[in-house]
Amino acid sequence: MRPTSSRQNPSVRRLIATAVTTAAVATVLLAGTGAGTARAVPAGNPGPYARLSPIAELSARRLATADLVAAAKWGTGGPVDDPVRERQVLDEVAREAGEPAATVRIFRDQIEANKDVQRALHRRWDVRPSEAPSVRPDLAEVRAEINRVNHALVRAIARTAQDRGAPCCGGVLLASAVQAGGELRLDAPHMTALHRSLGSVCRP
């Protein structure tokens, strides 16, 4: 069955609720940062976990939107890849970032991880049509939520210039990702994608 445009399906409502929660978290993280380019700030009193964990949390919440994006694209005949949209995202974060090159590398991983989940879901729905979504979320609305998370993630990255080069970065991100994935009840494919999304956060 191909999906129809509707918001009455309970599973889609749950996914939209996750996106709304994502927007709320993004709003909190953005509060007080002001507009314009995100600049790296010196490490304050909080430890590396407190500074790095928002990157893992926001990455997990961004990844959770892949289910909605996959549902929106399902049955349209179009590909998962959207080079125009991807370039728009990368150009926007480059303009906002204090470290454009590093931030763009991180967001490339974010985009590829999101597409990994979309493809996995489409393969599952091809094999198990009964699990496929019966309604199609509004992709523009979903992307608006993703954009809010993107803004917060750019700022979270900017706050961690020193921590991303520290020896503890990888371990802290791993622990943060496990916690964030558990809170969102991400399954194995989502967790694999989450780890991919964080692959360029720590500097060599």
What are these regions (language model features)?
Residues 1-41:
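Secretory targeting and sorting signals
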Residues 2-3, 14, 163-204:
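Glycine-rich, aromatic-bearing surface loops/beta-hairpins
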Residues 44-81:
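Immediate post-signal-peptide N-terminus of mature secreted/exported proteins
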Residues 57, 61-64, 85-92, 105-116, ...:
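Charged, amphipathic alpha-helical oligomerization/scaffolding segments
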Residues 71-98:
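N-terminal, post-signal-peptide region of Sec/Tat-exported proteins
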Residues 72-77, 121-124, 128, 160, ...:
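Secondary-structure edge/capping motif, primarily at the C-terminal ends of alpha-helices
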Residues 99-131:
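Mid-length scaffold segments of soluble, non-membrane domains
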Residues 126-160:
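Extended amphipathic alpha-helical interaction segments
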